[in-house]
Design a protein with these regions (language model features):
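Conserved SAM/SAH-binding loop-helix junction
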Residues: 63, 82-86, 104-107, 150
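Conserved SAM-binding loop of SAM-dependent methyltransferases across substrates and taxa
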Residues: 80-93, 153
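Residue-level signal for pocket-adjacent positions within structured domains
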Residues: 13-15, 39-42, 82, 126, ...
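Class I SAM-dependent transferase core
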Residues: 1-74, 104-121
Length: 213
């Protein structure tokens, strides 16, 4: 594991206001080693160069850490585990549920979480609109679902009263924000700056219409 990647991750996390130990950083990078190995057998990610993986997978995921509320967080359409797996390493006191409709992706996540000792991660194989958990979640986050309104429509029932839906977006989604389902409102739109990434990033924070902002 090149020390330069450890340093890049630690410095980038610090710039994002996220406190990581060197052990945390090494666990995140170890998860990328597992991703590379599994990616040879199944297409989990098109990003194969390690510097880009650190930036576009790990630091991009950590860019939303300060908006996460616990103790229960759901990552919808987690894919290969982003943003949920890096956030779980950075926030060990919060329970993360990673949901996806593709079983093979969840098999990878279960393997990687076990390999790096992320005991606060569980997986669910279903679609968000079909998921009926015993307890709802304080935060529901996704960087995979398309339009913000669709995300809210599919996953809104999974969020507790007073909780937040967090949609990770690229450019400012002006038109999408005008098409939220009834009963929901935009609490805030945060412009994110991901260290090492020269691309626009925004986080849309959605809550129920009667919730205080």
């Amino acid at each position: 594991m090149p020390e330069s990647h450890v340093s890049t991750l630690l410095v980038g996390a610090q710039q994002l206001g996220v406190t990581l130990t060197e052990a945390d950083a090494r666990r995140m990078l170890a998860s990328l080693d597992e991703l590379d190995e599994w990616n040879q057998r199944m297409n989990l990610t098109a990003i194969r160069e390690r510097p880009q993986q650190v930036t576009k997978h790990l630091l991009d995921s950590l860019s939303v850490a300060k908006f996460i509320r616990g103790p229960r967080v759901l990552d919808v359409g987690t894919g290969a585990g982003f943003p949920g797996l890096p956030l779980a390493i950075a926030m060990p006191d919060i329970q993360f549920t990673l949901l996806d409709s593709t079983a093979k992706k969840l098999k990878f996540i279960e393997h990687a979480a076990h390999a790096i000792g992320a005991s606060n991660v569980e997986t669910v194989h279903t679609r968000a609109e079909s998921f009926r958990p015993k307890e709802r979640f304080d935060t529901v986050v996704s960087r995979a679902v398309g339009a913000v309104g669709v995300f809210v429509e599919w996953a809104g029932h999974l969020c507790i009263g007073g909780g937040r839906l967090l949609a990770m977006k690229g450019r400012y989604p002006t038109e999408e924000l005008q098409k939220l389902p009834s009963g929901w409102k935009v609490a805030a739109v945060h412009r994110l700056s991901v260290p090492g990434l020269d691309e626009e990033r925004h986080l849309v924070e959605v809550c129920r219409s009667h919730d205080k902002i």
